[in-house]
Design a protein with these regions (language model features):
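C-terminal catalytic core of tyrosine-transesterase DNA break-rejoin enzymes
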Residues: 2-9, 119-145, 152
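Residue-level marker of regulatory loop/turn positions in helix-turn-helix DNA-binding domains and
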Residues: 43, 109, 113, 117-118, ...
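Short, polar N-cap/turn motifs at the start of nucleic acid-interacting alpha helices
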Residues: 16-26, 114, 133-152, 176-177, ...
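Active-site/catalytic core of tyrosine-dependent DNA strand-transfer enzymes
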Residues: 53-112, 186
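C-terminal secondary-structure termini that scaffold catalytic or DNA-interacting sites
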Residues: 35-39, 44-45, 49, 64, ...
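Conserved beta-strand positions that form and line the central face of beta-propeller blades
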Residues: 30, 73, 116-119, 152
């Protein structure tokens, strides 16, 4: 929800894909185009290298993972996670719905029970759009194919993308609010 990455990009994220950007005091991840995904054949969706920019929330999570594994950013029993949409994710959804219900004194939206990991990527994209981030920058941050974007970024361009990602940082209470519109059934 803070990086726009796909499930397997998170599960199989490797420390050797991290690139330090000292002029910005941060790092980014560059997932290789031949990344195999869950079955070692799915690869990065658009066939290009995938730049993963970290906003402040994502950076703090990555920093907490340092030292847990020499190879994997998010290890599970010494190797990469297989998938995130498992029983733990389902239990977390139930806990989140219950907490929301307790805080708001009304039932949680039924959608809480069916939120998928990929929905977090969509949420990141929607929040970027609501924050006024340009389409070109949204494509770069979401890893969508864009003919004018390459895997070569200047420090200023990376700084701009980090700034855009921070516009939707979960720690910023001034972040964009999304209103879900639905048509009433006739």
């Amino acid at each position: 929800v803070n990086t726009g990455t796909r499930e397997q990009e998170v599960c199989k994220l490797r420390w050797d894909w991290e690139i330090s950007v000292p002029e910005l005091g941060t790092s980014v991840f560059l997932i290789p185009a031949d990344f195999g995904g869950r079955h070692e054949r799915s690869g990065v969706k658009n066939g290009d290298e995938r730049l993963v920019v970290l906003n402040n929330v994502a950076k703090s999570i990555i920093d907490q993972q340092r030292g847990l594994s020499k190879e994997w950013v998010f290890p599970y029993n010494g190797s990469a996670m297989h998938r995130m949409n498992d029983s733990a994710w389902k239990k977390a959804r139930v806990r989140a719905a219950k907490l929301w219900q307790e805080e708001n004194l009304r039932p949680a939206h039924p959608g809480y029970a069916s939120i998928r990991i990929h929905d977090l990527k969509h949420t990141f994209g929607r929040r970027l759009r609501a924050a006024g981030v340009t389409e070109e920058d949204r494509k770069a941050l979401l890893g969508h194919k864009n003919g004018s974007i390459t895997s070569h970024y200047s420090g200023a361009e990376l700084g701009h993308l980090i700034e855009a990602a921070n516009m939707v940082s979960a720690t910023d209470s001034r972040g964009p609010v999304l209103t879900i519109l639905k048509r009433k059934q006739a």
